[in-house]
């Protein structure tokens, strides 16, 4: 018969497995272990059903699992290896390496379910994190230890922007990064790994000198793995924060898939769906993850989360729930990507809590607001231009439109990671140069330069050089 820590499988419904224990029941969120097709299969307790039965979510495929199979209670939540041993490695949701580089050495492990830091432990200082990307640093700056959302539909450049941020910040940053690939394409995960090796972020010959740990639960994984892999990545990031006391960067691509996986298992667990078919616990699940991503007195976690927007609808419950937790939002717009302007960041929709004169300074704030003012005026004139044409505008409005079109193009920038598409080297622009360049454009100092000179360049010196090249070609 089954003992206290031993149970047996009584029912298998896809990713959900019922297990009966005749002795003491394992606690909610405890990890259970069984063997399926000669492979270790981890289950996580989700519900107590009565009659000594628990309902669990499987962290891997359940094909081949049969009723009566023995199950062992591990006595605590899923625990994963943490610390320097994970640097340069790719782990799955239960902390097993999937990069064929042997087992993860090191003996420190940590449970993936942890309480959020208390108010007393949290740090409240605000400081800008410079990314080197003009449109972000100027109009929606990121704060150290903040949570940043990258919103966008399919194919507008979320993953490319995340890769550029890893590239820019990991190179100039002494801290560690953790990348959690949640329910995204395996090909992209593979590309990212090789790109990190090429750029030196992962040192394949000496893994301990690497700056990043990767945790993957891709599209082909069962929903249990996709619903928990973000927590596994966050657990690694928390350990780096607590042990090294530095600013840790935590990238999630894509937080929507975390919600999607939760909704897939929710119906199997017998919960009545909420709005648009999502799980009724949507806000609770999101809060449990997001509240752990924070700065403490020991160090900080700055997180950048790609958020897929289903059908480009920002009012969908999944992206709308994540809005509440963010310090800055970077909204990627299909209309801007159709103009060929990359990064396709919407300068009027993107926001930041720290775009405040007391944090970023008067000059930065005033230049950012002036840029947004000109772009907003251009947006409101577009209907008139479409119906009546440019000739019907006043001289002042014509000047505003000309400046707005230059600013729009000046907000584009070549990326290092997109060199394969563009053929041009990426540029990182220091914050002071970004502010000075846009201040000069807003004040009309470069009204005489052609629009084309502002497209896909770094600071204003690059614009002047490009204008001279264009003039020489035209001559």
Swiss-Prot record:
GO terms for cellular component: plasma membrane; proton-transporting ATP synthase complex. It is a peripheral membrane protein. ATP binds at residues 152-159. F-type ATPases have 2 components, CF(1) - the catalytic core - and CF(0) - the membrane proton channel. CF(1) has five subunits: alpha(3), beta(3), gamma(1), delta(1), epsilon(1). CF(0) has four main subunits: a(1), b(1), b'(1) and c(9-12). It is found in: Cell inner membrane. Pfam families: ATP-synt_ab (PF00006), ATP-synt_ab_N (PF02874), ATP-synt_VA_C (PF22919). Produces ATP from ADP in the presence of a proton gradient across the membrane. The catalytic sites are hosted primarily by the beta subunits. Its EC number is 7.1.2.2. One of its GO terms (molecular function) is ATP hydrolysis activity. The gene is atpD. This is ATP synthase subunit beta. It is an enzyme of class 7 (translocase). Keywords: ATP synthesis, ATP-binding, Cell inner membrane, Cell membrane, CF(1), Hydrogen ion transport, Ion transport, Membrane, Nucleotide-binding, Translocase, Transport. It catalyses: ATP + H2O + 4 H(+)(in) = ADP + phosphate + 5 H(+)(out). Belongs to the ATPase alpha/beta chains family. Gene3D superfamilies: 2.40.10.170, Bovine Mitochondrial F1-atpase, Atp Synthase Beta Chain, Chain D, domain 3 (1.10.1140.10), P-loop containing nucleotide triphosphate hydrolases (3.40.50.300). InterPro entries: AAA+_ATPase (IPR003593), ATP-synt_VA_C (IPR055190), ATP_synth_F1_bsu (IPR005722), ATPase_a/bsu_AS (IPR020003), ATPase_alpha/beta_chains (IPR050053), ATPase_F1/V1/A1_a/bsu_N (IPR004100), ATPase_F1/V1/A1_a/bsu_N_sf (IPR036121), ATPase_F1/V1/A1_a/bsu_nucl-bd (IPR000194).
